[in-house]
Amino acid sequence: MEEYCRPATLEDLKALITSLNQQEVDYLLIGGYALFAHGYHRATTDIDVLVPATEESGRKVRKALMVLPDQAAKDIDPAWFNEGGNIRVADAFVVDIMLNACGETYETLKQYSETVDMDGLLIRTINLEGLLRTKQTMRDKDMADRAVLERALEVLQEREKSRDHGFGG
C-alpha cells in the first residue's frame, strides 16, 4: 500500500539505476532526482523514470525492478507498456515508470538525453531544456521547478553569449 512507502533515498536511486543499466533498459531519469543530478536539490519522495512504451521495455524494466526490497514489480505485466499509461510501483519506496510526462515520451525526449556521472555511476537523464518540457503542469512543485529551470537556462545562455564574444577568433 502506497501510504506505507518511505521516501526514496539516494542509495535507492543508485541501486535502481545500477539495475536499469545492468538490464540494458532504455530509460531517462526525470523528476526530482533528475534535478538533483543537475545540482538542484529539492525534496522528493519518489523516483521517476521515463521509458519507451513497448512490451520489450516492460520486460526489461520489470526484471530491473526486482532489486526493490518488496519485489512489487513481480505484478507488472509487460503488455501494460503498450498501453502508454504510467505505472506506479509502490514498493518500499515509490518508483513511477513514466511512458508519458506532460505529453512527452521517451522518443520525444531522447534528443535531450545526457549522461551524468554521480559518484562513478552513469545515469541517463535529460538536460535542463528537456526537464523544462516535463514541468508544464500547474502543480506547485512543477511551477517552482519551472522557475528554477528557466533561470538556469537563462544563465547558461548568457554564459554562451559571453564566451562567443570573448577573446580568440
Q: Where are these predicted regions, by residue range?
A:
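Compositionally biased terminal segments of proteins
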Residues: 1-169
